[in-house]
């Protein structure tokens, strides 16, 4: 046959699968790669140290990033995007577009405080940020700072300038062959379930990322 068959869209889960935090999912199609959420792993020190190891994907090839809401386990690693090579837009609701820059700046400031605590030996974070025994985690940490800093205030501000808000229920094309529609998830102000419509040959496939639903 002379006609190629379009590759079926795929989903790869890099977090919040078998666990609660670190939400991060990659949607891949023939023509686009969309990352939905890029949140922090939280909890025990071993969980937090996972934040220093980026997902095994080429961020430079991403077509778009979407954020469901401004809770740190869904957005907390967005500040890493400039260091990882992503220079595109971050799509979210209009209220989340207002909140995200503030949340990321606050996170960067908190990381600086934790580094100071580590260096002067004060606070529980001196233990939390101890170098991990896992060689892969330790090597990844060296790419940033030792002890690891995920991103600076400058990184956070750069990402903040790339955030684009969209109204609920309005379709918006965010990547070649991919449209987005946001639905109110009722979780926090601006929270959304993300509906993506993918052009797949003569078909259209829809995928819904629920995000966090409801007030708890």
Regions found by a protein language model. Give the residues of each.
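Eukaryotic helix-linker segments that join adjacent hydrophobic helices
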Residues: 159-167, 172
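Catalytic core of the metallo-beta-lactamase
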Residues: 7-10, 14, 26-29, 169-216
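Hydrophobic/aromatic beta-strand patches that form the interior of the parallel beta-sheet core
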Residues: 12, 34, 66, 91, ...
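Cysteine-centered motifs
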Residues: 1-3
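Residue-level detector of functional hotspots within protein domains
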Residues: 10-13, 51, 56, 76, ...
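Pre-active-site segment of Zn-dependent metallo-hydrolases
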Residues: 17-22, 29-88, 92-162, 213-216
């Amino acid at each position: 046959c002379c006609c190629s068959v379009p590759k079926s869209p795929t989903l790869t889960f890099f977090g919040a699968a078998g666990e609660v935090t670190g939400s991060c999912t990659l949607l891949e199609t023939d023509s686009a790669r969309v990352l939905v959420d890029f949140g922090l792993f939280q909890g025990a020190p071993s969980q937090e140290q996972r934040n220093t190891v980026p997902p095994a994907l080429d961020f430079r090839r991403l077509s778009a990033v979407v954020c469901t809401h401004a809770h740190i386990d869904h957005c907390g690693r967005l500040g890493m995007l400039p260091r990882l090579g992503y220079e595109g837009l971050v799509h979210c609701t209009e209220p989340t577009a207002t909140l995200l820059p503030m949340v990321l700046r606050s996170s960067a400031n908190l990381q600086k405080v934790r580094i100071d605590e580590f260096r002067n030996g004060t606070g529980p974070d001196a233990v939390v940020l101890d170098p991990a025994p896992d060689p892969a985690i330790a090597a990844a940490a060296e790419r940033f700072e030792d002890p690891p800093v995920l991103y600076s205030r400058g990184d956070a501000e750069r990402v903040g300038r790339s955030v684009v808000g969209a109204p609920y229920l309005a379709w918006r094309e965010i990547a070649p062959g991919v449209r987005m529609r946001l639905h109110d998830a009722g979780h926090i102000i601006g929270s959304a379930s993300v509906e993506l419509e993918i052009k797949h040959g003569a078909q259209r496939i829809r995928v819904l990322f629920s995000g966090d639903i409801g007030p708890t």
